[in-house]
Amino acid sequence: MIRNALLVLVFVLIGTISAATDADMTTDSGKQPSNINQLTLVSPEGKRLLRQGSVKEGGVHDATEERAFIVTPLKNSLYRILAAFGLKPQTLYVQLGIRTGMANALYNRLYHSYHRWYATYGPRVYG
């Protein structure tokens, strides 16, 4: 029961993080809107163009910048909570139905992100 509630909380926060990441990419492109409320008015096509513009202007982008999105403080704290409750990536893999191929992209993204975090920062077992 607690695990299901925790999974719902994680899904809600992952959606929030995705929206915040898009807003950060929009503001990082150097073409900031005059009003903070205008961020919601930027279409997905406009966001894509802003991202492309920031990549062209920025120069060299290494893999650490791409991976920086999984080490945000909110995700890090959520993954620590999941690890503290004993939820392993394999548990998510089974519970979310990823092994059956019926899971949507959000579940796959959550699983892969948590799996990478768990491999890097999760509890170490030496036996």
Curated annotation (Swiss-Prot):
One Gene Ontology CC term in the entry: extracellular region
Job description of the protein: Effector that is involved in host plant infection. Contributes to virulence during the early infection stage, by inhibiting plant defense responses induced by both PAMP-triggered immunity (PTI) and effector-triggered immunity (ETI).
Motif (RxLR-dEER): 48-67
Family, similarity comment: Belongs to the RxLR effector family.
Keyword flag Secreted: yes
Key words of the record: Secreted, Signal, Virulence
Domain notes: The RxLR-dEER motif acts to carry the protein into the host cell cytoplasm through binding to cell surface phosphatidylinositol-3-phosphate.
Disulfide bond sites: none
Cellular compartment(s): Secreted; Host cell
Residue stretches spanning the membrane: none
Source domain of life: Eukaryota
Residues spanning the signal sequence: 1-19
Stated name of the protein: RxLR effector protein CRE6
Source organism: Phytophthora infestans (strain T30-4)
Induction profile: Expression is induced during host plant infection.
